[in-house]
């Protein structure tokens, strides 16, 4: 089943632009060029994986300039029969940051019975064009108690971002223009019933463990790193209790709209 595309990404959900900023030429406003990326897709085949994701796909960057990742929409669909047990945690990562708690931009937990889900993250920070060309963002996926044979794809994810491209540092800051910004740190969103069992294992802890485990194995391709679905490596004790509880989760199926892939 492919994700169903419905409508466009609403820029106003991320940036509160005034009427003058919408009408005036860019030279007269602090906001220069607001763009929506094309869709980037990841097919998840592993129980645990850290994969690169292109959040600026189709975005025209300015040489020697900057790009501000204002917000992104992540849509997912389980490729499973109805009412399957288990679930997933999804975390957006900035791979430049060495401290795991600073590298996590936002995370989301949901059960497999949900079938389709969507969440938004508001990173709201700028990077140089040179850094952006190195594809610095990743997604950490941790699937629990989904019993599927190795070699198949239980979950599909799609990513669309809203960003601002500019040549020089904007004199008037953008933070006051961005809606729903959480200044307390990385956002962790969840379905309530999943959060009951998962909140004691923050995604920053999972990221730190994954990075340590990967470094011991030696350098590998960053795309789809992680343990295979048939791997038998024992879990850390702190995860065992979560696994037992998580196995009994069943949530009502809910529909959600999916971000459009157009860029402009």
UniProtKB/Swiss-Prot annotation:
Listed result of changing residue 133 to K: In strain: Ltbl; ability to grow in tomato plants harboring the ToMV resistance protein Tm-2
Chain positions covered by the region annotation Disordered: 211-264
Outcome after substituting residue 184 to E: In strain: ToMV2(2); ability to grow in tomato plants harboring the ToMV resistance protein Tm-2(2)
One of the Pfam families matching this protein, by short name: MP
Protein source organism: Tomato mosaic virus (strain L)
Subcellular location, principal: host cell
Impact noted for substituting residue 238 to R: In strain: ToMV2(2); ability to grow in tomato plants harboring the ToMV resistance protein Tm-2(2)
Gene name in the database record: MP
Annotated localization: Host cytoplasm, Host cytoskeleton; Host cell junction, Host plasmodesma
Xref: InterPro entries: TMV_movement, Viral_movement
This protein's name: Movement protein
Biological function: Transports viral genome to neighboring plant cells directly through plasmosdesmata, without any budding. The movement protein allows efficient cell to cell propagation, by bypassing the host cell wall barrier. Forms a ribonucleoprotein complex with viral RNA. Triggers host hypersensitive defense reaction in incompatible tomato plants harboring Tm-2, Tm-2nv or Tm-2(2) ToMV resistance (R) proteins. Transports viral genome to neighboring plant cells directly through plasmosdesmata, without any budding. The movement protein allows efficient cell to cell propagation, by bypassing the host cell wall barrier. Forms a ribonucleoprotein complex with viral RNA. Binds microtubules and modulates microtubule stability. Can bind double-stranded DNA. Triggers host hypersensitive defense reaction in incompatible plants harboring resistance (R) proteins.
Subunit description: May bind to host RBCS at the plasmodesmata (e.g. Nicotiana benthamiana RBCS AC A0A0S4IJL0); this interaction seems required for viral systemic movement. In resistant plants, interacts with host MBP2C at host microtubules; this interaction prevents virus cell to cell movement. In resistant plants, interacts with host resistance (R) protein (e.g. tomato ToMV resistance protein TM-2(2), AC Q71BG9) at the host plasma membrane; this interaction triggers host defense responses leading to programmed cell death.
Family membership noted in the UniProt record: Belongs to the tobamovirus movement protein family.
One of the GO BP terms on file: symbiont-mediated perturbation of host programmed cell death
Compositionally skewed regions (Basic and acidic residues) per UniProt: 237-247
Keyword Transcription regulation in record: no
């Amino acid at each position: 089943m492919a994700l169903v595309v419905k409508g466009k990404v609403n820029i106003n959900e991320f940036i509160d632009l005034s009427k003058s900023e919408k009408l005036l030429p860019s030279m007269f406003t602090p906001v220069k060029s607001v763009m929506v990326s094309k869709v980037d897709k990841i097919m998840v085949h592993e129980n645990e994986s850290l994969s690169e994701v292109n959040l600026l796909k189709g975005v025209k960057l300015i040489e020697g300039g900057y790009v501000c990742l204002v917000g992104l929409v992540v849509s997912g669909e389980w490729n499973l029969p109805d009412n399957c047990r288990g679930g997933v945690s999804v975390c957006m990562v900035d791979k430049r940051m060495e401290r795991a708690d600073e590298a996590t931009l936002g995370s989301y937990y949901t059960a497999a019975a949900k079938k389709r889900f969507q969440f938004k993250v508001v990173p709201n920070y700028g990077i140089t064009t040179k850094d952006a060309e190195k594809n610095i963002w990743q997604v950490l996926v941790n699937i629990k108690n989904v019993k599927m044979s190795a070699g198949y794809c239980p979950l599909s994810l799609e990513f669309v971002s809203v960003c601002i491209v500019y040549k020089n540092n904007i004199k008037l800051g953008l933070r006051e223009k961005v809606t729903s910004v959480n200044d307390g740190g990385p956002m962790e969103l969840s379905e309530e019933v999943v959060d009951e069992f998962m909140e004691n294992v923050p995604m920053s802890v999972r990221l730190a463990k994954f990075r340590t485990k990967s470094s011991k194995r030696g350098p590998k391709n960053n795309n789809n790193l992680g343990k295979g679905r048939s791997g038998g490596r024992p879990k850390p004790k702190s995860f065992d209790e979560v696994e037992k509880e998580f196995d009994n989760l069943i949530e009502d199926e809910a529909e959600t709209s999916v971000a459009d892939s157009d860029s402009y």
